[in-house]
Amino acid sequence: MAKRPVQKIDFSPYGAAIKTARTGQKESRNKVGNEMYLSPRYLANIENNGQHPSLQIFFELMLRYNISVDQFL
């Protein structure tokens, strides 16, 4: 059976929105990382390199910064 093609999602716009919201609230990556149990480098990769976070981390970041996923659809 042939595999169904999987659509790759470009996460860059989400990462940029997270970075804008985080810096707008004057929060450092270290602060956010400590509070969310993430490394600052991982957060930087999400913000700058479009790394796909786990669904749980994605959900927590969207809630933390009140970002609507609908704006990217």
Each language-model region and where it sits:
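Short basic helix-loop element that most often maps to the first helix and adjoining turn
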Residues: 16-35, 60
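Recognition helix of helix-turn-helix/homeodomain-like DNA-binding domains
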Residues: 37-52
